[in-house]
Amino acid sequence: NKESKYSPMAKEWYRLLDGMYEENCNISPVSFYKTSMIIANQNDIEFGFYNQNDVQEFLVFFIDSLHESLCKKVGINITGSIKNDLDKIAFECMTKWKEYFKNCYSKIIELFYGQMASFIDVEGEIKSRTYNPICFFALPIANKKDITLYDCFELFTAPELLNGDNKWFNDKDNKYYEANKRTVFWKFPNVLIISFKRFNN
């Protein structure tokens, strides 16, 4: 996408990769680094102001930049008929996916983005459904011995009681309700990027 303000990022990344596969070649990422800083500063991204940042912040910025430089409008068609509740959720997920990416889709989305579904349950009735794309999975670490990655995913998706000051607000009637929040992974990306939350608040 030549019109994208992020295109220089993709070009510098290509040059860097191209040089890495050359024989007897010295590699310096200075040009790639400078281009990253310029693009970040131009877009008011905190990463670009030479402050201390971690690799997660840069990786999100980098993936988003590649996506913006490569994306284009696409036609996304949803076919099939709704026969049960699961089909209804699938249709809603795909509809949201289409809304997010129909005007800006790239191979980066296919590789690095998944989708999460969150449900708000009040007295046994689902009152709210949200479907969001996700690129980076920040998993909590289970407080037990011999933990596995599956334990961390289970903790990440554990049901959450919304009560007290954290009650769910229903904008249809402008009231707060005690509710249960449930989160599931609807679609995993082909490349799963995970970080672990090492600290508790």
Q: Language-model features: where?
A:
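UBL (ubiquitin/ubiquitin-like) substrate-recognition surfaces
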Residues: N1-N201
